From Swiss-Prot:
<dbReference type="GO" id="GO:0019843">
    <property type="term" value="F:rRNA binding"/>
</dbReference>
<dbReference type="GO" id="GO:0003735">
    <property type="term" value="F:structural constituent of ribosome"/>
</dbReference>
<dbReference type="Pfam" id="PF00203">
    <property type="entry name" value="Ribosomal_S19"/>
</dbReference>
<dbReference type="GO" id="GO:0006412">
    <property type="term" value="P:translation"/>
</dbReference>
<keyword id="KW-0689">Ribosomal protein</keyword>
<dbReference type="InterPro" id="IPR023575">
    <property type="entry name" value="Ribosomal_uS19_SF"/>
</dbReference>
<comment type="function">
    <text>Protein S19 forms a complex with S13 that binds strongly to the 16S ribosomal RNA.</text>
</comment>
<dbReference type="InterPro" id="IPR005713">
    <property type="entry name" value="Ribosomal_uS19_euk/arc"/>
</dbReference>
<dbReference type="InterPro" id="IPR020934">
    <property type="entry name" value="Ribosomal_uS19_CS"/>
</dbReference>
<protein>
    <recommendedName>
        <fullName>Small ribosomal subunit protein uS19</fullName>
    </recommendedName>
</protein>
<dbReference type="GO" id="GO:0022627">
    <property type="term" value="C:cytosolic small ribosomal subunit"/>
</dbReference>
<keyword id="KW-0694">RNA-binding</keyword>
<comment type="similarity">
    <text>Belongs to the universal ribosomal protein uS19 family.</text>
</comment>
<keyword id="KW-0687">Ribonucleoprotein</keyword>
<dbReference type="InterPro" id="IPR002222">
    <property type="entry name" value="Ribosomal_uS19"/>
</dbReference>
<dbReference type="GO" id="GO:0000028">
    <property type="term" value="P:ribosomal small subunit assembly"/>
</dbReference>
<keyword id="KW-0699">rRNA-binding</keyword>
Length: 151
């Protein structure tokens, strides 16, 4: 006879929350460190810096290089689709909703900046390496692979 596993109330509630989240989408409105997106977009850069992570604060406390400044000005403008090689610019709330084509060393990866990306580098969203997908062994790789039919 197999004993039944007891299910805790906690796990039932967790599953119910997960199912509800899947139905409704985002559970609550976006906020970054207690501030809504509209508040963040209305802030000046010097008001916003204390909210960013230490690495981003340090990066913005130093001056931006020429390429970063050019991209920053383009992102603040009205242009929709922007192509760039600059991967080390940190996403600010003013950039949300813009579409960027970022170079990954081989091709341009197109993505839209979302509120969840605030405080991250642009380069994090266009990966430079492909995920390795291994297939079967090649001819001569093992002793048994000699007898595999060639394509």
């Amino acid at each position: 006879m197999v004993a039944k596993r007891q299910v805790s109330v906690k796990s039932i509630k967790r599953k119910a929350r997960k199912a509800q989240k899947a139905i409704t989408g985002r559970a609550k409105e976006f906020s970054y460190r207690g501030h809504s997106l509209e508040e963040l977009q209305n802030m000046e850069l010097n008001e916003l810096l204390p909210l960013l992570p230490a690495r981003a604060r340090r990066s913005y406390s130093r001056q931006m290089n020429h390429e970063q400044e050019k991209l920053y000005e383009k992102l603040l403008g009205d242009k929709e689709n922007i192509k760039t090689h600059v991967r080390d610019l940190i996403v600010l709330p003013q950039f949300v909703g813009k579409t960027i084509e970022l170079y990954n060393g081989n091709s341009y990866i197109k993505f839209e900046i979302k509120p969840e990306m605030i405080g991250h580098y642009l380069g994090e969203f266009a990966l430079t390496r492909k995920e390795v997908k291994h297939s079967g062994p090649g001819v001569g790789a093992t002793r048994s692979s000699k007898f595999l039919p060639l394509k």
